[in-house]
């Protein structure tokens, strides 16, 4: 049996540029609102999204980790402010969200991402472990995955240990036999380290580590190097 028994993998900014993806999805959403709900469009574009988000979370703090439902509630609130009745407001919000969500899952993979997923999935069970709301089927990565853990499912976000434990428990694997791969030093690397996982820092920007930063087990600056980094960790383990 392989000494390494599980790979957990961050998605946003590890496999694709999430900021670029969200900007494109927002443009699609705004165009849809302008055509299908002009009064709501005026309210949406004249307000800061972060402000709308915080206003919604003040009323429904339980949505903090469920980004899809949070956005639906934000859009529902905008529709109500535009004087749509509750039923129509909800229907329009859900239709608007679907436009946004289609764009949110229209990702442009970083070079080597799919090849890396293919290589890892042939050797190990791979679980997505994400604070975001990307749909693994709609992004096209589900064939490479044995499971997917999201913050909405757990009710917490990385680096909360419950996120990592959810993957370990679902896979039936202990932390010392797992590698977590991600781009975020705090959410991914520190979080993995706290529960005893090995880690690979995806440092595509080639950033320098500061004194207070966590130290990953391995570091890569391109996704094509991940397979070798995983092998190095595997070889370092005792049976």
Residue ranges and their predicted role:
Residues 1-7, 19, 35, 87-89, ...:
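Asp-based, Mg2+/Mn2+-dependent phosphohydrolase catalytic module
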């Amino acid at each position: 049996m392989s000494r390494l028994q599980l790979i957990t993998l961050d998605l946003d900014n590890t496999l694709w540029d999430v900021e670029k993806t969200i900007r494109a999805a927002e443009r699609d959403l705004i165009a849809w609102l302008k055509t299908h709900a002009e009064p709501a469009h005026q309210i949406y574009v004249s307000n800061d999204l972060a402000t709308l988000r915080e206003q919604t979370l003040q009323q429904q703090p339980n949505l903090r980790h469920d980004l899809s439902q949070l956005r639906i509630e934000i859009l529902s609130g905008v529709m109500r402010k535009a004087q749509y009745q509750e039923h129509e407001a909800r229907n329009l919000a859900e239709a608007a969200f679907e436009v946004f969500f289609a764009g949110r899952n229209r990702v442009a993979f970083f070079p080597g991402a799919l090849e890396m997923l293919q290589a890892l999935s042939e050797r190990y069970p791979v679980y997505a472990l994400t604070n975001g709301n990307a749909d693994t089927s709609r992004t096209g990565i589900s064939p490479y995955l044995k499971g997917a853990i999201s913050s909405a499912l757990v009710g917490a976000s990385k680096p909360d240990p419950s996120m990592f434990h959810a993957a370990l428990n679902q896979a039936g694997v202990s932390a010392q036999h797992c590698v977590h791969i991600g781009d975020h030093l705090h959410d991914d690397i520190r979080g993995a380290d706290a529960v005893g996982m090995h880690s690979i820092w995806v440092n595509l920007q080639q950033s320098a580590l500061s004194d207070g930063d966590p130290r990953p087990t391995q570091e890569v600056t391109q996704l094509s190097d991940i397979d070798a980094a995983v092998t190095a960790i595997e070889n370092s383990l005792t049976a």
